[in-house]
From Swiss-Prot:
This is Methyl-coenzyme M reductase II subunit beta. Its cofactor is coenzyme F430. One of its GO terms (molecular function) is coenzyme-B sulfoethylthiotransferase activity. Coenzyme B binds at G369. Keywords: Methanogenesis, Transferase. The keyword Signal does not apply. Coiled coil: none annotated. It catalyses: coenzyme B + methyl-coenzyme M = methane + coenzyme M-coenzyme B heterodisulfide.
Length: 443
């Protein structure tokens, strides 16, 4: 028996029905097989830039930006021999012939996707085993393939793994993981939140609803890891994932379509009308001025509706400007207007609006250190909302028309070209719906 009575219809990014009458728990990270596979692959996958390694060795550009070591140039036809290198890497990484190690060449051998076996993940204390094992395997594979001597072997290591272990991260490396090193996390359990918005956008190939869905899946799954989505709060996070992330009951699509020529204010008007119609909220009292105070029939469901409206308002507002910079102020003032309109708390009970205040300052106010695309849920500025703000940032970067200094192409080219090859990363909405369909009758 399901723990919750909620049942939802799941719609695609095109507004078409995918699966109906789905128990809410069928989209839970603890139950949905697609989300389980996605999280597993996030942890065990590594993108290796063979073309980058070849170029670094050829120019002796080792260890990061502006680092050149004249006289240490090494010319190796790495991309030309990508298949042989990939085969060697597979033999080094796998633990048995029939395990789930996966090696995939991408872009004619310029990149490799390496997925280490779950047996290695199972005996490791954290997820960095994937990067460390893959890095070591690639180094050895190149040395063996080209018979590199002991004097140039360290150059190969640096071209692959960067300055590590001089640094705690892989500065200057030609391998990338979606999850950053645990030592750089803002708090315990923040690993899945440590994926910048631009990476999410690149993986989903700038499809707005799929990008916000992937962001929501990662953010809300992290809530189960941090203990936020336990007990009384679990349903709130599941509803948020379903409605804001997965377009449950087509609410997100309907709000955007209805306000295609509207504003943040018209989205709020549509949302309140829909919430009243669906009996999520009701009038609690009416003042002499005619102003109506509302109360929710269901606090968790109201938060899910409000969060969906927030994402819709972001899509409408940023979509009109084709400039992502407005996402912070949209998140802020959507909540401000919504609270004045209804007398109800905003998204995430105030945390989304609070996050947006700092986000506005650090993304484009007098500080302006970085554009919206480089932020993530592990950032000291944007960590405070419990999974409801970052999907808006991902959506905004999908709609940006090239206004950003930190563009998706600049920050996330390798990540996008590699991870977008995995279908449930690229199109999470339809694949999570398939996973829900598999298990809905078993709950």
């Amino acid at each position: 028996m399901p723990m919750y009575e909620d049942r939802i219809d799941l719609y695609g990014a095109d507004g078409k029905l995918l699966e109906e009458d789905v128990p809410l728990e069928a989209v839970s990270p603890l139950k949905n097989p697609t989300i389980a596979n996605l999280v597993s692959d996030v942890k065990r996958s590594v993108a290796v830039n063979l073309a980058g390694i070849e170029g670094s060795l050829k120019k002796a550009a080792l260890g990061g930006k502006s680092n050149f070591i004249p006289g240490r140039e090494v010319e190796l036809p790495i991309v030309e021999n990508a298949e042989a290198i990939a085969e060697k890497v597979k033999r080094l990484v796998q633990t048995s012939e029939d395990d789930d190690t996966n090696i995939r060449l991408i872009n004619n051998g310029q990149q490799i996707l390496v997925q280490v076996p779950t047996t290695r993940m199972g005996v490791a204390a954290d997820y960095t085993v994937s990067a460390l094992v893959t890095g070591a395997a690639v180094v050895q594979a190149i040395i063996d393939e080209f018979d590199v001597d002991m004097f140039d072997a360290n150059a190969v290591k640096t071209a692959v793994m960067g300055r590590y272990p001089q640094t705690v991260d892989f500065t200057g490396a030609n391998l990338s993981t979606l999850l950053g090193p645990p030592v750089l996390l803002e708090g315990l359990g923040y690993g899945l939140r440590n994926i910048m918005a631009n990476h999410v956008v690149a993986i989903t190939r700038k499809n707005t609803l799929n990008a916000s869905a992937l962001s929501s899946i990662l953010e809300q799954t992290a809530m189960f890891e941090t203990g936020d989505a336990v007990g009384a709060f679990e349903r709130m996070h599941l509803l948020g994932l379903a409605y804001q992330g997965l377009n449950a009951n087509n609410l997100l699509f309907d709000l955007v379509k209805e306000n295609s020529k509207g504003t943040v204010g018209t989205v709020i008007a549509s949302l309140v009308e829909r919430a009243i119609e669906d009996r999520v909220i009701k009038v609690a009292s009416e003042m002499k001025s005619g102003y109506k105070m509302y109360e929710p029939a269901d606090w968790a469901l109201w938060n899910a509706y409000a969060a969906t409206g927030l994402l819709a308002a972001t899509i409408v507002n940023v979509g009109a400007a084709r400039a992502a910079q407005g996402v912070a102020s949209t998140v802020l003032y959507y909540n401000d207007i919504l609270e004045y309109e209804t007398g109800l708390p905003g998204v995430d009970f105030g945390r989304a609006m609070g996050t947006a205040v700092g986000f506005s300052f650090f993304s484009h106010s007098i500080y302006g250190g970085g554009g919206p695309g480089i932020f993530h849920g592990n950032h000291v500025v944007t960590r405070h909302s419990k999974g409801f703000a970052l999907p808006c940032v991902a959506a905004a970067m999908c709609l940006d028309a090239g206004t950003q200094m930190f563009s998706v192409e600049k920050t996330s080219g390798l990540i996008g070209s590699v991870y977008s090859e995995i279908d449930y990363f690229r199109e999470p909405i339809v694949n999570v719906a398939k996973g829900a369909a598999e298990i809905k009758d078993q709950l």
